[in-house]
């Protein structure tokens, strides 16, 4: 039996996204197969480092590093209490990727990720949408 699929997909292929920051396996797999890469809750400095590792893996497999869209998960917390309530026991682990401070400080921090090569940001936590809109 043949069935029609209408409307047709916009994309010719489904993009493959790889998430994580493991430098030996995850980033190597991303270099080989990913259309996009996302790393959660890292500092701008760690994003720079992991992005460089991904670039190195791409070069090792003969792939143009610019073929992979690079993104980062970030959270926004107004206060330490907000961070704790959003993430509980994980608060310290995600802290490097949490935007805090004034709107100007948040914008500056986002600029650091942009300078490091982040093309998209994924806001995490219930306060993210409000704070993104305000900043």
Where are these regions (language model features)?
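Active-site-adjacent structural elements that line small-molecule/cofactor binding pockets in enzymes
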Residues: 1-135
């Amino acid at each position: 039996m043949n069935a029609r699929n209408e409307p047709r997909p916009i994309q010719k292929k489904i993009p493959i996204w790889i998430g994580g920051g493991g430098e030996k396996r995850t980033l190597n797999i991303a270099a080989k197969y990913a259309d996009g890469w996302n790393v959660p809750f890292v500092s701008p400095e760690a994003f720079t480092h992991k992005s460089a590792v991904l670039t190195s893996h791409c070069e090792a497999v003969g792939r143009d590093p610019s073929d992979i869209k690079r993104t980062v998960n970030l959270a926004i917390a107004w206060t330490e209490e907000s961070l704790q309530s959003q993430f509980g026991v994980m608060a310290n682990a995600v802290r490097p990727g949490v935007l805090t401070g004034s709107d100007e400080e948040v914008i500056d921090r986002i600029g650091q990720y942009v300078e490091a090569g982040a093309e998209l940001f994924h806001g995490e936590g219930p306060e993210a949408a409000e704070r993104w809109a305000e900043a």
